[in-house]
Amino acid sequence: MDDIKDMPLHKPVMVEEVLDYLHPQPGHIILDCTVGGGGHAIKILDKIKPDGFLIGIDKDMEILQTTKQSLSKTAGKFKLYHADYSDIDEVLRQADIDKVNGVLLDLGVSSLQFDQADRGFSFAKEAPLDMRMDRSCGITAQNLIRRLSETELAELLWKYGEERRSRRIARAILKEEKGVGITTTRQLAAIVERVVPRGKGKIHPATRVFQALRIAVNKELENLEIFLDKIYNYMAVGARIVIISFH
């Protein structure tokens, strides 16, 4: 198991763009809904100090423990919450905050999570087929596969991964599951690779499959819809929302 405390500081993506569009100012209250390793949060705190306040949310408790140490080294005021951003109303109630001036979401899996082999997000490393961002609750990718029919799995791979060969892949996965069983990342990747040979210069055949399973396991799109329905009730006049997504 890789210890997250020993990993290098997470380098946030599109920092200048985030600061430009979010436009944090001294005294602002900013909501970082996927605070992760704190890369964006540190930059935001520098812009809103001394009287601003940052609320950081993440469903990954393991990352939050390290992030708190990193943010404590700044002069900014902040509070971190172990929660999903779909529970934003409860988080803001606990923080006693009515309105915010800015909101940031960096969707998907972080590089910190990806680099932790035992999390199961990467097929490049042998690991249990987990994929949960919050390992204290929810269903693992391994158990999700066991619960689905061939049709359901194929639909999931198409809906969340836009995988054109979803039915062939689903059939091969469930055949293996009913036989020897599927318990690890590389085992799953090998099954997909047998069905869809890797083309020259193209992404690994299992990329879309892993993406689809991760999105389903963590209910990423459902939680995003819930969040977007709620957040406008807490936006101050002139507030901004910045969402980063790569798929």
Role assignments for model-derived ranges:
Residues 1-247:
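S-adenosyl-L-methionine-dependent methyltransferase catalytic core, i.e., the SAM/SAH-binding region
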